[in-house]
């Protein structure tokens, strides 16, 4: 009897300890999520979260990633995190193979804020915690949308990036790294404001972001904010909401002075240069079609290096006289050494 009582007491004690060991966090869909005290086996089905986790030096705690991470992060990203090459890929932004996921025995799964509710339920139903990341704040009804309507876009993405980094860092128990990453992300905003504060709205450089198949970003996305902070104007913002495919006629009408292409889509540059339909656009006439460096991630969602480095790169490209004294190469290499633990190696991007 005493032995039985002792066993029951031990069991209750262990259960109590387990309960105390769990943590409750709030994700960026405002969901309360209970996660283990320590994360040893995370699955990351969102490329933005994966990039932040790499910068937090948390890849040893990751066992699975989204299937198209190379396309989303660019073909050269593997140099920054070679350990990703051999990781399991049990799903993507919009779906999950539940059997493959279960085989990994994950402690937590990160998904994007617009992951289908059925996908989140599918994972939750097998008792795996799901953390949704948006890297933005804003109105409640917009939190789960890919293309939101935001009252104050700048505040939504500034606050949301900070909140998102801190949340991911909390899950991985990387608070110090998270605090340092947030600080680095916003470190150059004053520099840009001081140098470009006198550029009036009508003098901003008219800029177009060229994605594959005439995709571009309009209002409600970080892309336009990157341009704004760098003294540019997103020509698509007035008529396009979110990420959308447009027509060549739209681009001809907008007639941008500069065309930007993201590092992850290098084939878009020769496609534009070799298509006579684009020839009369001002950016083509002035030879200002720029392939952006990998750190200048002008994505719909903000990345810390995009704020810290990408906005400076763009400002320097558009207003070289105002930033002659800024040693961007040193700035970039210092960031890479600190957060990617390697040197920056430029590919073919405009510098």
Curated annotation (Swiss-Prot):
Q: What top-level branch of life does the organism fall under?
A: Bacteria
Where is this protein localized, as stated in its record?
Periplasm
**Binding of molybdate, residues:** 47-48, 217, 264, 300-301
> What InterPro entries does the annotation carry?
ABC_Transporter_SBP (IPR050902), ABC_transptr_periplasmic_BD (IPR002491)
GO cellular-component terms in the record? Answer: periplasmic space
Functional note: Part of the ABC transporter complex MolBCA involved in molybdate import. Functions as a low-affinity molybdate transporter. Binds to both molybdate and tungstate, but not to sulfate or phosphate.
| Quaternary structure (record) | The complex is composed of two ATP-binding proteins (MolC), two transmembrane proteins (MolB) and a solute-binding protein (MolA).
Q: Which family does it belong to?
A: Belongs to the bacterial solute-binding protein 8 family.
Q: What is this protein called?
A: Molybdate-binding protein MolA
Organism of derivation: Haemophilus influenzae (strain ATCC 51907 / DSM 11121 / KW20 / Rd)
């Amino acid at each position: 009897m005493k032995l039985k009582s002792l066993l029951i007491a031990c069991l209750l004690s262990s259960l109590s300890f387990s309960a105390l060991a769990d943590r409750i966090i709030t994700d960026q869909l405002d969901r309360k999520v209970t996660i283990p005290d320590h994360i040893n086996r995370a699955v990351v089905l969102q490329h933005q979260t994966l990039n932040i986790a790499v910068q937090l030096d948390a890849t040893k705690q990751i066992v699975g990633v989204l299937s198209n991470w190379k396309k989303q992060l660019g073909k050269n990203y593997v140099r920054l995190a070679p350990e990703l090459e051999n990781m399991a890929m049990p799903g993507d932004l919009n779906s999950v193979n539940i059997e493959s996921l279960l085989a990994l025995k994950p402690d937590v799964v990160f998904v994007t804020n617009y992951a289908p509710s059925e996908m989140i339920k599918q994972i939750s139903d097998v008792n795996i915690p799901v953390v949704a990341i948006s890297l933005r704040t804003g109105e409640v009804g917009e939190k789960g949308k890919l293309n939101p309507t935001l009252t104050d876009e700048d505040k939504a993405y500034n606050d949301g990036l900070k909140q998102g980094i801190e949340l991911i860092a909390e899950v991985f128990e990387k608070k110090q790294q998270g605090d340092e990453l947030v600080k680095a992300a916003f470190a150059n905003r004053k520099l840009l404001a001081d140098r470009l504060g006198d550029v009036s709205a009508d003098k901003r450089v008219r800029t177009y972001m060229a994605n594959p198949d005439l995709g571009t970003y309009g209002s409600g996305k970080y892309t336009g904010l990157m341009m704004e902070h760098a003294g540019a104007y997103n020509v698509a913002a007035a008529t396009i909401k979110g990420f959308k495919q447009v027509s060549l006629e739209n681009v001809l009408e907008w007639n941008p002075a500069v065309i930007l292409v993201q590092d992850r889509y290098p084939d878009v540059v020769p496609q534009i240069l070799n298509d006579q339909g684009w020839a009369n656009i001002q950016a083509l006439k002035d030879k200002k079609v720029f392939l952006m460096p990998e750190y200048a991630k002008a994505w719909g969602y903000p990345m810390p290096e995009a704020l810290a480095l990408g906005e400076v790169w763009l400002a320097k490209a558009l207003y070289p006289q105002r930033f002659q004294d800024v040693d961007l190469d040193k700035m970039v290499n210092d960031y890479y050494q600190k957060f990617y633990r390697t040197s920056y190696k430029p590919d073919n991007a405009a510098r």
